[in-house]
């Protein structure tokens, strides 16, 4: 199967980006003309262009932020005097403005809710009088059907005025939006290009979803977040914070293979999905390896782990979790050792990971002499993606950045601590190879549990020497004089124009007596 690369459909108006973020934009075929009668009255007035200045984190220079970039996308007016857009349009925004079609002025906005895992965000305007003349767009209460006609509204690159393209719904699937979050996704053949992100998709005068991505290696393939996902998001953030989508933390496999069925001694009438090993599973879960999940709620699960969603639509059974979860549990019917059982399986909002993402935050760091320490995050390890040489090297030495990428944290290892920047030039590390990207195993033979724990170990050390072991094969150890490292830190900060030795969370630990 051809693997498709997706672009986040926003306009990157910066003059240049870091080299590994550059992409070649292919020419898009002209969009199909839209008949005037297809445009709902006043809808154009409620689709806005979003301008944002982004200051993303720099995981390799964690004491600073990345250079600002100017981007633009789209948004749509919804109830409650709010603008709905995509998280990737306004994530890490230091400034946001919106502008309505044909308007001469921009209106300042504030990001009040973000769900990066499902790519949704809400804006509030500083001047809410805007909404007196810009009405909310009505949302459809049901999914569109495959082959339904849709219109994509937005402000794609190539012009300043509102663009409307026409297409049909070609596919509806339940797919992964991020590493640990899945949701419904609508595929359309309407042109959805950079800048369309956050614009509404309209069918029969109502919004059926929000544009968020397109395929870079194919023409006229776009993706829409359907209203069901939007409604879940809006309900979640009604209390002022985003908790995340409920998910069943269990790995399963299909039940198609006849030998597997014979091994499980299943009657031909039994269909479902088989529970794999439960190492990542909630200890409170009633599920065991080799259980066969046959139903979720009242929905039968077939041998490909799918449930029916209408006459001509099947999706992964996990889709029902977001509908059926109550009080942190979801009802399942299972077959175990030939017996049918009804169980309540726990659900959670995503998995906790040893290497998490920053989720909209900035990295914590601590500078000790010429060495910068930080937590390993998905953003930090992103340089391995697409870099076969680095990935092979890290795999060969057994770096936890590769070998433990999907692991959960534990009491012994809450997170991975890395040397997040090349050593600052200094005689204290003269003769050592640069340990950028190396994971800390121990300080003076004490295993490091977390970044906070490591800072406490350095603070409380009494020995003349500090011995740093790294978690890999063949990596040299580091031995430095404790007092010299402490004494040199201030001048190293000054020489490199760094204001703070560490982030507040870690300096509070370092300065604690």
Regions found by a protein language model. Give the residues of each.
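Short, conserved beta-turn/loop elements at beta-strand boundaries and strand-helix junctions
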Residues: 55, 114-118, 170-177, 255-257, ...
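Conserved hydrophobic positions within beta-strands
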Residues: 75-77, 109-111, 169, 275
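C-terminal recognition in membrane/secretory proteostasis and scaffolding
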Residues: 23-29, 38, 53-55, 64, ...
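Conserved active-site neighborhood of the chymotrypsin/trypsin-like protease fold
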Residues: 79-162, 194, 218, 340-342
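Bacterial N-terminal signal peptides
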Residues: 8-16
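A short, Trp-centered hydrophobic/proline-enriched beta-strand micro-motif
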Residues: 43-60
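Active-site region of chymotrypsin-like
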Residues: 46-50, 126-137, 163-219, 232, ...
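A conserved glycine-rich beta-strand in the N-terminal activation segment of trypsin-fold
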Residues: 31-37, 57-80, 86, 105-108, ...
């Amino acid at each position: 199967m051809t693997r498709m690369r997706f672009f986040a459909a926003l306009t990157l108006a910066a003059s240049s980006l870091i080299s590994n973020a550059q992409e070649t934009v292919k020419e898009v075929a002209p969009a199909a003309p839209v008949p005037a009668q297809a445009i709902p009255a006043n809808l154009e007035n409620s689709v806005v262009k979003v301008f944002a200045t982004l200051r993303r984190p720099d995981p390799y220079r964690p004491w600073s932020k990345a250079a600002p970039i100017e981007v633009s996308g789209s948004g749509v007016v919804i109830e409650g005097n709010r603008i709905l857009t995509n998280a990737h349009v306004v994530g890490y925004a230091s400034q946001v403005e919106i502008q309505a079609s044909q308007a001469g002025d921009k209106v300042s906005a504030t990001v009040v809710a973000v769900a990066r895992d499902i790519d949704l965000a809400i804006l509030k305007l500083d001047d809410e009088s805007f909404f007196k003349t810009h009405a909310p767009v009505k949302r459809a209460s049901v999914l569109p059907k495959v082959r339904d006609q849709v219109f994509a509204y937005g402000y794609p690159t190539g012009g300043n005025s509102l663009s409307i393209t026409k297409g049909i719904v070609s596919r509806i699937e339940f797919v992964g939006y991020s590493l640990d979050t899945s949701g419904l996704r609508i595929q359309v053949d309407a042109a959805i290009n950079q800048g369309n992100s956050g614009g509404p998709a309209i069918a029969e005068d109502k919004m059926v979803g929000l544009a968020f991505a397109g395929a870079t290696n194919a023409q006229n393939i776009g993706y829409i977040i359907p209203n069901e996902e939007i409604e879940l998001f809006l309900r979640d953030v009604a209390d002022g914070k985003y908790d995340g989508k409920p998910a069943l933390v269990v790995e399963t496999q299909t039940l198609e293979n006849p030998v597997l069925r014979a091994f499980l001694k299943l009657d031909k009438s039994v269909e479902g999905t088989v529970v794999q090993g439960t190492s990542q599973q909630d200890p409170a879960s009633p599920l065991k390896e080799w259980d066969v999940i046959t139903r979720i709620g009242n929905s039968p699960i077939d041998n490909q782990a799918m449930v029916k969603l209408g006459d001509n639509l099947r999706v992964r059974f996990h889709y029902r979790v977001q509908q059926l979860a109550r009080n942190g549990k979801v009802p399942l019917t299972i077959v175990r050792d030939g017996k049918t059982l009804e169980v309540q399986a726990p659900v959670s909002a995503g998995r906790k990971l040893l290497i998490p993402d920053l989720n909209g935050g900035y990295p914590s760091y601590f500078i000790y002499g010429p060495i910068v320490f930080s937590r390993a995050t998905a953003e930090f390890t992103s340089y391995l993606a697409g870099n076969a040489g680095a990935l092979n090297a890290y795999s060969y030495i057994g770096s936890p950045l590769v070998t433990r990428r999907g692991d959960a944290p534990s009491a012994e290892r809450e997170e991975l601590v890395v040397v997040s920047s090349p050593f600052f030039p200094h005689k204290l590390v003269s003769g050592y190879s640069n340990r950028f990207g190396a994971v800390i195993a121990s300080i003076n033979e004490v295993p490091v549990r977390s970044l906070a724990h490591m800072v406490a170990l350095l603070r409380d050390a009494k020995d003349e020497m500090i011995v740093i072991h790294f978690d890999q094969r063949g990596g040299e150890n580091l031995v430095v004089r404790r007092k010299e490292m402490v004494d040199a830190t201030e001048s190293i900060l000054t020489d490199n124009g760094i204001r703070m030795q560490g982030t507040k969370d870690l300096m509070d630990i370092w300065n604690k007596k």
